[in-house]
Amino acid sequence: QVKSIVKILARYQGETKLFIVPFGEIQKKISMNLEVPAKLRVVLYRRLMFRIAEKIAWFSKSKGLVTGESFGQVASQTLNNMVAIDNAVDMPVFRPLAGMDKADIINDSRVIGTHDISALPCTDTCSLFMPKSPEVSAKLREVEEAEMMLKDMQSWINESLEEKEIVK
């Protein structure tokens, strides 16, 4: 699905490289760590995803990260959670859809041809390791304390980057 969506988006953004990074094992390790509050898992997943994305961005000589997030779509997309997630990286994070209405985003996805692909059933790792009650208003201090319980976090990031696949 992702490869098909990237092909469509490449029509609008020029040269595109897709970096596929294995992340399921990292999520599994976080979810199995009993010292980490379950409600903070999603924010921690996103912080590690952003750290990995930042390393790829530096490697690619990019100046920032761009996401398709919109406020309030899912638990991780609240202002407090986005602030806690963004704090994990040093480069700017751009969210061009942040203030758009969900119906407008869906309509635009139909216009450019990504909607039907996005709507196909797919088991993503986020849903596999989703806590019952994810935090919707994370406090940065609590997130950083929970993250300190992830002793091997840097090695997980490095291992994921070593296994990345680049699709042009």
List each language-model region with its residue ranges.
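ATP-dependent adenylation/nucleotidyltransferase module used to activate substrates
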Residues: 1-111
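Peripheral terminal appendages
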Residues: 16, 62, 82-91, 112-168
